[in-house]
Regions:
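Short hairpin/turn module used for nucleic-acid contact or packing/dimerization
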Residues: 176, 183-228
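Conserved hydrophobic beta-strand within the GNAT/NAT acetyltransferase core sheet
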Residues: 25-28, 165, 199-202
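Generic detector of contiguous secondary-structure segments
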Residues: 1-23, 47-50, 114-133
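Conserved acetyl-CoA-binding loop-helix of GNAT-fold acetyltransferases
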Residues: 2-18, 165-170, 176-189, 208, ...
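Acyl-donor-binding surface of acyltransferase catalytic domains
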Residues: 11-80, 224-226
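Short amphipathic alpha-helix that is part of the acyltransferase structural core
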Residues: 60, 73-109, 132-134
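A conserved beta-strand-loop-helix scaffold within acyl/acetyltransferase catalytic domains
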Residues: 103-170
């Protein structure tokens, strides 16, 4: 450290971004990211980035729930109108349609990569209105192989049997019906049934929403970005 290596690496990264005509650089938040921002544990390093043109834009968190009693930690669903289950390969086109309509960026790309890596659909909890997929939650099981894992399992080696939830979302036409709560509750219950001892929800600022389900802050991060 203190030899200019970090500055040179950042300079090279910025050079490549400019070649690609990009005008904004984020710290973290990339596909298969390590972190969604600068870890609060390293907040003293924020000054280093600020001296190089980065600005702070708020923060985000990873949340955790420790499963002490399987029965007590399970959650009741609020809807009986929709069907909740794990996806299969037969749901691939339906998931692609959902992502293309609502989240055509990284979530769609992550889903495509998941299936290209041999995913069967099992890591996606889905809610259906008839045959239409109207909500999803990506999950990581304690047994999920590494090529199929999401950021929610980044910390898996620190735990006995970690489960993960995220990303997740509800179709724009189905919001404000408690489907967001229910898809998380369903994923929570499935992970408990699969012997998760802890569950992490990654990269969120919805603390009040998830605290209702027993989650608390595990790690915090600073959003930092630089405009070219």
């Amino acid at each position: 450290r203190n030899l200019g290596i970090g500055s040179k690496l950042l300079e090279l990264a910025e050079k490549e971004m400019r070649k690609m005509k990009k005008n904004r650089l984020y710290l973290g938040r990339d596909l298969l990211n390590y972190f969604p921002g600068l870890p609060i544990d390293l907040k003293n390093n924020a000054e280093w980035f600020e001296k190089r043109g980065f600005n702070q834009l708020g923060n985000t968190c990873d949340l955790i729930k420790i499963i002490k009693d399987k029965n007590c930690e399970k959650l009741l669903l609020r809807n009986n109108t929709y069907t909740f289950r794990l996806a299969t390969l037969a749901d691939k086109d339906g998931l692609l349609e959902l992502m293309t309509k609502n989240w055509p960026g990284r979530w769609k790309e992550e889903m495509i990569e998941y299936f290209n890596n041999g995913g069967t659909g099992r890591e996606y909890a889905i809610a259906l209105d008839g045959n239409k997929i109207c909500a999803f939650a990506k999950m990581g099981f304690p047994q999920t192989p590494e090529p199929l894992e999401s950021y929610s399992l980044t910390w898996r080696n620190r735990f006995k049997s970690l489960g993960g939830i995220g990303p997740l979302g509800v179709d724009a036409d189905y919001r404000k019906r408690n489907l967001g709560y229910d898809i998380v509750a369903f994923a929570n219950n499935v992970l408990i049934d699969n012997n998760a001892t802890e569950i992490i929800i990654d990269w969120t600022s919805l603390l009040d929403f998830y605290r209702k389900m027993g989650f608390e802050v595990f790690k915090s991060y600073l959003y930092m970005t630089k405009e070219f």
